[in-house]
Amino acid sequence: MKANKEQIRIGFAGSFDEPIKRINNNSIDFFNNKKYVSYGDNNDFPQYIYKAYMQCGILQGIINGIVDSLYKRVKSNDISDDDLLKCLYDYIIFGGYAVEVLRSKTLRIVKINYLPFENIRVNSTKTIGYYSNKWGKYTGKTSELPLNDDTSTHSIYYYSGRLTRGVYPVPMYFSALKSIEIQNDIKTFHLSTIKNNFNSNVIININNGNYTEETQREIEKLINEKFSGAENAGKMVLMFNDSKDNAADIVRLEGDKFDEKYQALDKSTKEDIFIAFRATPCLFGLMPENNGFSKEEYAEAMNLFEENVLEPLLLTFVKSFKAGVVEIVDNDDKIIEVTQA
């Protein structure tokens, strides 16, 4: 006589198995017969970066503060103020920027126009640049221009920064991208919990569960899709049962101290983001807890930030252009000479 075995299957709802977006510069892709290097695993890394900037208040506040500080220090006779500001934003958000350069027949610069960096792709030798508003869409149009070519009357000047992975730049806060994702997910989770007015941390026991393994997996999948994830936090559970004996049991888990865990996670991820920028939180309006911050301490922190972060960023940005295209000015709008490397 065979032993009667009970099969118990435990499913974990809400597991996170999607890896963070990666920069992969080894794959060559084709788009409208153009051969370019993929910008990320799915050629969407800059879109991912920009979305992170738009959704994370801390990241946006730091980047906006840095750009504002740099913009006050630069001027150009060849680039409009608006385009110069956009170049600075791309420089900090993506780690690089791109502009369209128009030259006369004698190769004198006539005009420089800003190009959204997320729309640029390049070939493996960084000699050809491709521009499209709809990468990945078969209906998108692609423009092809020589890259960083001073002998062409129409070209793209492409700056990929000092920190690169192959042909594309890496933003200075790359190490904090996971923390930025967590910050955004925490906000989404709490918003969903408030909207649904129900915050559950439960085990669902499916009674009379004599189902095949395939059916169990399908039930688990459906529950995961409907109730797991930050965007589904706090949804009401509605079940239909043929009898009370066969009803599903929902057991609420108490004592997990989720509030404390979220507070600790929120604090550690914020610190991680500021560390990536080598910034003190108080410089961007986030005051330290349980202790004061004097004017002297603020001034010292600002001086260190200017010396170690802002000045190097400023010099690198100005030197990335041809001499005289972008210049540094003092508080009286007087030009400060910079020795080109």
What is the role of each PLM region?
Residues 162-341:
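A contiguous, surface-oriented mixed alpha/beta subdomain in the mid-to-C-terminal portion of proteins
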Residues 1-243:
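Structured, contiguous alpha/beta core segments that scaffold functional sites
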